Amino acid sequence: DVYKRQLLPDARRVCCEQELLQFASERRKIEWLSVRVLLYFMLKEDKQIGYSSEGKPFLTDDSFFISISHTKGYVAVILNPKTPVGIDIEQYGKRVHKVFDRFIRPDEQVEAYQGDTTWGGLLHWSAKETVFKCMKNADADLRKLCLSHFIPQKEGTFQVREYATEGQSLFSVGYRICEDFVLTWTSC
């Protein structure tokens, strides 16, 4: 309770306390509140987040495009005043290998980072989630997104081509590998 008072303005804190009642899970409450605190920290003013019928977040005053992601212990928010954006954060975990067939295309190659292909797999997964969030009415088949070949470094950029639309847009995706997660972001 002390932290909420220090991190959000009083009017917003009261509103948040009421909105938090909709969540049963303590983890989900923390994620939801963390996003609002991070947004307030970024903008130094209170903003309301709404959600489209597809579940995509938006600021109710339309001042910025927004994308949100969370993973165990972390949240990520990206804003852009002019163009839609996407962001994704994925915690390190070997389980990603079990689902490679759901998102890695035969013409894609997953490279290792510091001898571990888990990082490369997570970057593929995260980048495709990021681009998917940025696209309008996107097909949820992540195999319709193709990463250009790249050798993972601690941070950098790579290209992602989407094959879900006639336009087959090309996205530049930024990334960073941290101690226990990867973070990817793009703008449309």
For the regions a language model picked out, list residue spans one by one.
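Core catalytic alpha/beta fold that binds nucleotide/phospho-ligands
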Residues: D1-C188
